[in-house]
Amino acid sequence: DVQWLDLGHALEAVASLPADNPGVPKAECAEAAYVMYTSGSTGQPKGVMAPHRGVNRLVFANGYADITPEDVLAHFSNPAFDGSTFETWGALLNGARVVIVPQETVLDPVRFGQLLLDEGVTTMFMTIGLFHQYADALAEPLSRLKHLLTGGDVIEPNTIRRVLKYGAPENFMAAYGPTETTTFATTCRLNDLIDEGSQKIPLGRPIGNTQVYILDGQGEPVPIGVTGEIHIGGDGVALGYLNRPELTAERFIPDPFSDEPDARMYRTGDLGYWRADGLIEFVGRNDFQVKVRGFRIELGEIEARLAELSGVRDA
C-alpha cells in the first residue's frame, strides 16, 4: 500500500488561514507541557504533569545523546507512553528528522530492520521487551545506530553481550526513569561495561540537570554500598499528579539538597545503592508494585478491585 498526501488541498487550506501568529501566551519552563497517565491498568490512573523544562533537559545537553540536525530518529512508541517524548522532541527540538514507523512494520522484524536501514535511522529507543525479542533479528541495523537506548524493565545481560559481540551501536545505553521524572533520569553506557561475569545492569548515572539521592528512612544520604530509597530531583521532576493533591504531597516532597527554594524531589519507591565507581545499582521495590511487560502494576489496587466483587471475602 502507498500512503499519499494531497499537497494541493493542504496548501489551499493553509492559504485560507491568517498569516499572523496566533495570540497564544508564551509557555514558561515551569508550566506543564503535557499530562501522561501511569499505573492505570488497575485502579485509578495518575495523571503526571510533566514540565516544559523536563522535556528540554531530556533532549538538550543531556549528557547521554548528542542529537544533531543530521540525525534521524525512529518513532514507534505509543503517544501514551513516555518513551514517545524522547522520540518526538528529540527530533523536533534539535532539527532532526523523525521517521514514523507503522505498527504493522514494528511487528515484522524483517520489514522493521529494512526500514531502519533504508531511512538511515541513527537514534532509537526500544522498550526492554521489544529489545529482548528483536536483538538478534535486528543485529545488522542496530549495529549501525549512533544511539540505541533501551529501558522500562530489567535488562538481560546475555542479550546485551550478543549485541556487543555482533557489533554494537556507537552509543548503546540502558535508560531508567519513572514517568514522574520526565522519561529518563539516569543512563548507563553499555559498550564497555559488560563482561562475562556481569549478572546485573546498573541504572547508571544521572543525566543532565538531574540529581539522584539515595536516602535512608530519616531522609539522610546513605554511604556507598548501602541500600536506600532512590529520590530524583532536578528539572525533570513533574509538577505532581493532576487533581490528586494528597498523593502529590506524598510522592513529591521538598528537596533539602537543592539551592532552589521551592525545589522538590520525587520518591520513586525504588531501592538501590551507589557503587564505588559512581554508578547506581538497582535492588528492588519498597512496596508491592511490579512491572509486567514494562507496565507498572499496583498489586494493592488489584486486591482492592477483587474485594469489590460479590462473593469475594478477601483478596
Where are each of the predicted segments found?
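Conserved AMP-binding
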Residues: 32, 77-84, 104, 179, ...
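AMP-dependent adenylate-forming
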Residues: 1-25, 55, 171-174, 189-315
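Conserved AMP-binding/adenylation subdomain of ANL enzymes
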Residues: 46-74, 82-122, 188, 192
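Gly/Ser/Thr-rich phosphate-binding loop
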Residues: 93-96, 121-125, 131, 135-202, ...
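A structural signal for the hydrophobic beta-strands that form the central parallel beta-sheet
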Residues: 34, 75, 100, 126, ...
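ATP-dependent adenylate-forming carboxylate-activation enzymes
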Residues: 11, 96-117, 125-130, 154-155, ...
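Conserved pre-ATP/AMP-binding loop-to-beta segment of ANL
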Residues: 20-37, 44, 67-73, 79, ...
